[in-house]
């Protein structure tokens, strides 16, 4: 099961995710992530360095997050090749900054 920590540095809200971001995990963390984003609507980074798996619920969370800030102000970084490939296949790379 996954979890996250967050920090704000130089105006950028960064979420550091770990583990498997499955449906149950996303149901538990989704509101926490979105509530923090509502307070900080500038630049947001989802750091996926410690993530092994994402479910469609995490993709939905990304969509909800993008609706709170301008999509050009949200980035997904440090993901493994498989996750990056899947996000690109479904078109999320065209909407969010995926690095």
Regions inferred by a protein language model and the residue ranges of each:
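STAS-typified acidic loop motif
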Residues: 2-31, 50
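Amphipathic alpha-helical interaction surfaces in cytosolic regulatory modules
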Residues: 23-95
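Short acidic-hydrophobic, aromatic-tinged amphipathic segments that line or gate anion-handling sites
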Residues: 97-99
């Amino acid at each position: 099961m996954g979890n996250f920590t967050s920090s704000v540095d130089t105006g950028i809200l960064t979420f550091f995710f770990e583990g498997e971001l499955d449906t149950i995990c996303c149901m538990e963390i989704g509101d926490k992530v979105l509530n923090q984003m509502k307070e900080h609507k500038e630049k947001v980074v989802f750091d996926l360095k410690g993530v092994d798996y994402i479910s469609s619920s995490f993709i939905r969370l990304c969509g909800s997050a993008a609706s709170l800030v301008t999509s050009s102000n949200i980035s997904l970084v440090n993901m493994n090749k498989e996750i990056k490939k899947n996000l690109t296949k479904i078109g999320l790379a065209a909407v969010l900054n995926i690095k």
